[in-house]
């Protein structure tokens, strides 16, 4: 089924609100309220949902709703488990160390999600660079490398890749993109290292000396969550779940097909992580 071009307008309007309302003086404070954001979402989403239901029936809505639940389950599990890990410590904030931090984050993002990797690394990265005066570029490149470009090697890395996996793209297909991933990551890391060397050279002596004195070894707390990450990865790769299109059409062989085993595992893992983490 095809839809007219103007059916995209509510989505475009939502993106425009997210991008513009926070920076417009007359609407910035209003937009900070969750009730305002919810009002805009309902104003644009409810009429669109009703129109789609009247045009296409409940099949596409059920199928899309199933995908949404599957996506939220993965995001929720990764968010909770990554929140249970704390990488503590404070090493020297040299360009070399910062670049290694970002490189590790760019790799981890493919396996624990861009959100999970960013949550795990941003705190020790900020702690490491707290003595430096020039650190904004480090946060920006963390967003570029860890929270964006890094998560491309598995469907867990980024939401569009996971949605593609739900639509039949093989779990290991994204590994074929390793050359593109390596090129992009290498280019960003080289750019960051060059910028950070210049900014590091412009730091005053007092900041560098303070950074050299305040050094603590890195320590990983909540190690049990590494096991939970492994369980999530295995569940995405091997555990069965709902087939949205089959459910929408009423096609299933037994009650087993009605149980979202993958999501059950994810929510269970998230609950265990919440209970067992430090």
Task: Name every feature range the model reports, one short phrase each.
Residues 134, 154, 163, 172-216, ...:
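Juxtamembrane and boundary regions of transmembrane helices in multi-pass small-molecule transporters
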Residues 1-7, 11, 17, 42-47, ...:
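Intrinsically disordered, low-complexity non-transmembrane regions of multi-pass membrane transporters
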Residues 113-118, 137-169, 189-194:
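Alpha-helical transmembrane segments and, especially, the helix-loop junctions at the ends
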Residues 10-25, 41-52, 70-85, 122-126, ...:
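Central hydrophobic cores of alpha-helical transmembrane segments in multi-pass inner-membrane proteins
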Residues 229-278:
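Transmembrane helical segments that form the transport core of multi-pass membrane transport proteins
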Residues 23-27, 47-67, 79-94, 107-120:
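Transmembrane alpha-helix boundary signature
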């Amino acid at each position: 089924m095809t839809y007219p071009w103007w059916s995209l307008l509510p989505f475009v309007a939502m993106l425009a609100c997210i991008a513009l309302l926070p920076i417009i003086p007359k609407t910035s404070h209003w937009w900070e309220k969750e009730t305002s954001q919810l009002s805009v979402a309902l104003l644009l989403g409810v009429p669109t949902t009703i129109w789609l239901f009247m045009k296409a029936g409940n099949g596409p809505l059920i199928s899309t709703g199933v995908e949404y639940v599957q996506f939220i389950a993965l995001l929720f599990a990764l968010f909770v488990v990554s929140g249970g890990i704390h990488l503590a410590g404070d090493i020297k904030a040299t360009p070399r160390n910062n670049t290694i931090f970002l490189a590790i984050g760019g790799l981890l993002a493919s396996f624990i999600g861009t959100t999970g990797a960013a949550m795990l690394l941003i705190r020790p990265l900020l702690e490491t660079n707290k003595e430096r005066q020039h650190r904004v570029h480090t946060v920006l490149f963390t967003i570029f490398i860890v929270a964006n470009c890094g998560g491309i090697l598995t469907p867990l890395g980024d939401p569009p890749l996971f949605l593609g996996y739900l639509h039949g793209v093989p779990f290991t297909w994204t590994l074929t993109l390793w050359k593109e991933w390596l090129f992009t990551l290498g280019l960003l890391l080289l750019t960051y290292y060059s910028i950070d060397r210049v900014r590091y050279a412009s730091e005053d002596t007092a900041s560098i000396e303070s950074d050299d004195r305040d050094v603590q070894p890195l320590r990983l707390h909540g190690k049990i969550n590494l096991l939970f990450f492994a369980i999530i990865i295995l569940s995405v790769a091997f555990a069965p779940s709902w087939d949205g299109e089959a459910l929408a059409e009423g096609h299933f062989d037994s009650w087993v097909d009605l149980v979202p085993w993958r999501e059950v595992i994810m929510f269970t893992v998230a609950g265990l992580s919440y209970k067992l983490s430090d």
